[in-house]
Amino acid sequence: DVRYRVPNVNQCKECHAAEDKITPIGPKARNLNKEFEFNDGEFNQLTYWMNRQIIDDYPMELVSPVDWTDESQNINDRVRSYLDVNCGHCHSPTGNANSTGLYLHLDETRDIHLGLYKKPVATGRGSGGLKYSIVPGKPDESILLHRMISLDPGVMMPESGRALSH
């Protein structure tokens, strides 16, 4: 049983604002850049679509996420992939949370923008009295985990849409 309410425009902007425009959160090429089973065999999805002229082209040099639920993958890659798909749309230079300086999209490489020992700038009481966004190896000292597990509407992240299936 799922209860859904239609959000108002301001609530839509919470997630769908990018560069001051409301935009859909849709598939990114990097999330589609993987093997997929088609009727005629298993192929890279983007290459398959390009060969069938469904798309014109795609960037060949893609940083693609790993399956964050796959325990055989590198833990850093798993965490980065999870944060990219669940947080990176808002937490990017063009996203609604750009003023935080916490950029969780997969292309980000600067430790400070990834939250490592980054002091909060816009969390208010969301910091829970903690000092840094992410303290490597110490999740209980990290604001990021505090906000992800909180049920307090003024603290929790994401602010709405807590579970996503990808």
Residue ranges and their predicted role:
Residues 1-166:
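Sequence context surrounding c-type heme c attachment/ligation sites in exported
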